[in-house]
Amino acid sequence: MTKKPAAKAAEEKMIVGIDLGTSRSAISASNGKRNWVDSYVGWPKDFIARKVVGKSLLVGKDALEHRLSLDLYRPLKNGVIKEGTARDEEAVKELIHHLITLVQSKK
């Protein structure tokens, strides 16, 4: 097993700042990328909805566009997880994951 040189390992680290908001969430990264999305997360209501939207999860604008086919969550209220249910927590995790993928460098 080979170890990466310390300088190379430091280059691969990325510092991010995330602002989870009730209506919009934003991210800014040390690689210079910035982005924001509407704070909506949606899961298809059933198998037919899954076929219509073509994904198992939609975030932001995509979720709003397909809101009739989705169980739509707006998981934050006043900067806090809204109800504290498992689905709200999962929605926040998915929202954060989506934000991070928006600023990651494509290799």
Question: Where in this protein do the model-derived segments appear?
Answer:
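Conserved phosphate-binding loops in N-terminal lobes of ATP-dependent enzymes
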Residues: 22-107
